[in-house]
Structures are given as C-alpha cells and as structure tokens.
Swiss-Prot record:
One of its GO terms (biological process) is ribosome biogenesis. Monomer. It is an enzyme of class 3 (hydrolase). One of its GO terms (molecular function) is magnesium ion binding. HAMAP family: GTPase_Obg (MF_01454). This is GTPase Obg. The gene is obg. It is found in: Cytoplasm. Belongs to the TRAFAC class OBG-HflX-like GTPase superfamily. OBG GTPase family. Its main location: cytoplasm. It comes from the Bacteria. SUPFAM superfamilies: Obg GTP-binding protein N-terminal domain, P-loop containing nucleoside triphosphate hydrolases. Residues 160-327 form the OBG-type G domain. It comes from Methylorubrum extorquens (strain PA1).
Length: 344
C-alpha cells in the first residue's frame, strides 16, 4: 500500500429539509387545521479514527465528501427524516487543520475517537408551527437551513513507541526488517526508504511499535529532502534509536548533524530519550571500529551500543534498552497522574 501523510479534502454537511404546507382533510370537516410537518435536519460530517489504517492514501483519489440533505416534511404532522451522515475514516495520529494549514481543528489519537467537522442544517418549520390565536390557518413554511462547507487539510503523524532516526543508508530499514515482520525496501544506496514504516517488535514477551523514519540530511528542518515532513513523524515517538553508520567517514560528525536537525525543528524532538548505536559493525575491522566508537562516544557524551542488523550483533541489547526507556517513561507518567480521591 502506498504511503500518504497529507491530503486536502472538501466537506459539506447536508441542507435541512423544507417544511410542509398542509391542512387536515377529514369527512364532515370542511376546514381542517394546518398539519404540515417540519423538514428533517441535514446530515453531519464526522471524522473517525479507526484501526487497521496507517496512511491517508484513500484521500488521494476522493477529495469531496457531502452528507445527505434532510427529507421534506409531510402532512399529518409527519417530520422529514434526518439526512445520512458522511464519515471520514482516518488512522490514529491524524490531525485536522483548517484550510490555512495552521488552525488545528481536531487531533485524532485514539481508535474510536469521533469529531464532528460540519453540522447539518436545521430543517424548516411546517405551517403547523406558525399557528397562532390570530392566524389559525398559516399558508407558509420555512425552507431548511443550508449546511456548512469547508476545505480541510489532513496530516498524519505516525504514533509509535520508538523511532529510528539517522542519516540515509544508516541501516534503519534493515534493523526494522530484522526485529519485526515489516518488509521495507532495502538496498545499498541512500534514500532507499522514501516513506515512514511501522512494525511491531516482540522481545522478551513484550511488545512495542517501532517506526522507521526516512533518512535525514542537512537542512531537513527547513524542508530539504522532505525532511520537515519526516521529522513530523518523530513528534509522536516516545523514544529514539539513533543509528550512526559505522562505515561513514566520521561517526561523530554524522551524529551531530542529525542532532542539529532535531534541535532546529523544535517540538521537543531533541529532548526525547535517545539510545545511540553504531550500526554496520560487521563491515568494520577492529581498529576502525575502535576509532569510530571513540568518535561517537565523544559526540554523544556516553557509550554507544554496537550493532549489526545483518549479523544480529547487539540487536537484542538495543531492543532491551528501548523497552527499559519505555518502562521508565511509563512509570514516570503513572506517578505524574493525580491519584483518584478515596471513596468509602
């Protein structure tokens, strides 16, 4: 399935149905009173977060969503039926913005969450509504109110427990394919990964979701190489596994470049817990490995992990380090939540 993380859609709620002008007709009653019913309310436009989706590709080929109009009122004080709603189904992590792209309308973070985007127009009153003591036989009814219409921008930010970051060709996709059932494209050239990918890691009878973020380059926070789009997916990750290619010219410089982009982008990316690892260790001789580790240790300010997704070296240690960080965060979040008041 193709990946799409931004789409522009047009939504319109249904118009209200018109009221009815009608009079009661019965045997032996020459002038029956008014009995025109009200029109039905127009359908609403909803957005719903559903399970099983991880892309907005459905909105590439269909951009217009219109709810049905309300039915007209009828005689015998019969009100019109409400128009059918229109529902946009999106994956968790989707944000809904107004047409200006800046005004946030809804943030869909949990499966089952529903938000009304446009309310249907009210139905018009039938002539029975206008009966008064001085006007016993009104001959007019209201038309229904028009629905709301607007253009909206949908943006998807993947929700994952941990995210893989690094320069292009750092071995992120190979790592994801090794530890999950995901099948990302893997090749020995930069920018093989063009879209973020997700996989479920099962380690030591525990599970967490891992996201493969496409490689970042210098200027990514300004949009170079679609970097700002990729960095947006890092916002929802709780822990970062920063892979630095061991075969790069200088591991320390490669690490600092990615850190600068995370800091420049903002949104708290540079403050997220980070696990640093030197990847592709199987391709290095002992002296080069020692030199690159020393460079990376100085740049990161701590001892990095050594791993090779191809040979399996250090993979389990990296997964346990991620799980430990997630457990620590979970404990801190539980302590931060206010305790429920005691009730007898």
């Amino acid at each position: 399935m193709k990946f799409l993380d931004e789409a522009k859609v047009y939504v319109r709620s249904g118009d209200g149905g018109p009221g009815c002008v009608s009079f009661r007709r019965e045997k032996f009653i020459e002038f029956g009173g008014p009995n025109g019913g009200d029109g039905g309310r127009g359908g609403d436009v909803w957005i719903e977060c559903v399970q099983g989706l991880n892309t907005l590709i459905d909105y590439r080929y269909r951009q217009h969503f219109k709810a049905k109009k309300g039915e007209h009122g009828m005689g015998s004080n019969c009100h019109g039926a409400k128009g059918d709603d229109a529902v946009l189904q999106v994956p968790a992590g989707t944000q809904v913005f107004a047409e200006d792209g800046e005004t946030l309308i809804a943030d869909m973070t949990e499966v089952g969450q529903r938000v009304r985007l446009a309310k249907g127009g009210n139905g018009g009153f039938g002539n029975a509504y206008f009966t008064t003591s001085t006007n016993r036989a009104p001959r007019h009814a209201n038309p229904g109110l028009e629905g709301q219409e607007m253009w909206l921008i949908l943006r998807l930010k993947l929700i994952a427990d941990a995210g893989l970051v690094g320069l292009p060709n750092a071995g992120k996709s190979t790592f994801l394919a090794t530890v999950t059932a995901a099948k990302p494209k893997i090749a020995d050239y930069p920018f093989t990964t063009l879209h973020p990918g997700l996989g479920v890691v099962r380690s030591d009878e525990r599970e967490f979701v891992l996201a493969d973020i496409p490689g970042l380059i210098e200027g990514a926070h300004e949009g170079v190489g679609l970097g700002d789009r990729f960095l947006a997916h890092v916002e929802r990750c709780r822990v970062l596994l920063h892979l630095v290619e061991g075969t790069s010219e200088h591991a320390g410089k490669a690490y600092k470049l990615v850190r600068r982009e995370l800091e420049a982008y903002g949104e708290g990316l540079s403050d997220k817990p980070e696990i640093v690892a030197l990847s592709k260790a199987d391709a290095l001789d002992a002296d080069t490995l020692k030199q690159q580790l020393a460079r990376l240790k100085r740049a990161a300010g701590g001892k990095p992990l050594v791993l090779s997704a191809a040979s399996g070296q250090g993979v389990q240690e990296a997964l346990r380090a991620i799980q430990a960080q997630l457990d620590t965060q979970g404990a801190e979040e539980a302590e931060a939540q206010p305790a429920e008041p005691w009730q007898p």
